[in-house]
Amino acid sequence: PKMTEFIASNGPWSQLVDQKNVELKKIFSEKEEKLTNDLSIIPLRVPHRDEYSETVGFKIIGPKKSALFIPDIDKWGKWDKSIIKLITQVDYAFLDGTFYDAQEINNRDISEIPHPFIIESLKLFEDLNKLNRNKIYFIHLNHTNPANNKKSKAYKLIISKGLNVAQEGSNFEL
């Protein structure tokens, strides 16, 4: 809802609305939206910086498979949902992997750039069975994230734990 108002009230986006180039449709957290006959989304509000709009992830439901898409979140423990439970309910989980660990951000205050570190996520997900760990793909990696490099210790650790780092150009059937 806040994003709808922001776009409609601020140029250059408001021009698209005024000229009817786009039609804004409000979506609401946890209310399923049918996009086509066999594809729907469920927005999931997540705690993250909300200067201009609410931040949401999505559960995406296709004709055969489903996915969880959470590219931005402050920390898993701040969410009123169980990320563990959500992972077990989908076929793929595309999750915030912005930063690998605190060393990557040097002396910056993590509260200014909040994201779960991949090493925190690895610890949180370690009790998932192999099938559920293998559903997880870290996405949204910052350019400084060592997991971007397949030869790095960071990348190899993620893979050794049974999780994945998403690769550009990959396709996932829904």
Segments from the language model and where they lie:
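Core dinuclear metal-dependent hydrolase active-site scaffold
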Residues: 24-86, 169-174
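A short helix-to-beta-strand connector/capping loop
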Residues: 14-24, 36-39, 159-162
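A generic structural signal for short, solvent-exposed coil/turn residues
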Residues: 16, 33-35, 50-52, 61, ...
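Active-site HxH/HxHxD metal-binding segment of metal-dependent hydrolases
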Residues: 1-18
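Cap/insert and terminal regions of metallo-dependent hydrolase folds
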Residues: 66, 74-171
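Generic hydrophobic secondary-structure signal
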Residues: 3, 7, 39-46, 58-60, ...
